[in-house]
Design a protein with these regions (language model features):
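Hydrophobic alpha-helical topogenic segments used for membrane insertion/localization
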Residues: 4-28
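Short, flexible active-site recognition loops that position polar ligands and cofactors
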Residues: 162-173
Length: 194
């Protein structure tokens, strides 16, 4: 390889990398709705549509086991309490959206913040609330199975747009799973230098 080609290859790689990054930035800025729709379709709606409400309820239960284990190992820190508070609040908010799909309430465009447990709730209380909240979500999935909404029913998600009830169940499962990975035990926090 000549000296010229040794310089040329990294330059081409750098230009290509910058081009990909610029393209990603363009898509993120100007095509974010397209990206969001693709995410909703590929990560939420398509996998959820292949499952029955019974299977989604079972998935919520299975994911709940891992969720409760992570919460059980969590050290009593403000950061961990904040994560659990967020998970509980968002799941309760999602439950209200599922009740809209069941015809039990009218749609209200609100945020998840009012559904969060109040300040000063202990870690142990949050762990119990998490278990109760997930049990209610599983119950809603079973009720959806017993009385499925009409085909094509959607309920608005403030950030993701309209979701089917099955999409909502998958979203709640995935959200809690991803957020709970932020929980840290005492040993993990020390290893990470916190």
């Amino acid at each position: 390889m000549t000296k010229r080609s040794k310089v040329f290859v990294p330059a081409v790689v750098t230009v290509a990398t910058v081009g990909v990054a610029a393209g990603a930035a363009y898509v993120a800025r100007y095509r974010k709705d397209d990206v969001k729709e693709l995410f909703v379709a590929q990560a939420l709606e398509r996998p959820a549509a292949r499952q029955s409400y019974t299977e989604l309820a079972q998935g919520l239960e299975r994911a709940g086991i891992a969720l409760f284990q992570r919460a059980g190992r969590a050290d009593d820190t403000q950061a961990n309490r904040a994560v659990l508070t967020h998970i509980i609040g968002l799941e309760r908010w999602g439950q209200e959206r599922l009740r809209v799909a069941l015809g039990e309430r009218e749609f209200v465009r609100d945020e998840h913040h009012p559904y969060k447990p109040g300040a000063g709730v202990s870690l142990r209380e949050l762990q119990d609330l998490l278990s109760q909240t997930r049990a209610r979500t599983v119950d809603l999935a079973r009720r959806l199975n017993a009385s499925p909404p009409a085909e094509g029913t959607t309920v608005e998600h403030n950030g993701l747009g309209p979701l089917t009830p099955k999409g909502w169940l998958r979203y709640l499962t995935q959200h809690a799973d991803l957020e709970s990975r932020k929980l840290r035990g005492a040993k993990e926090a020390k290893a990470l230098g916190e």
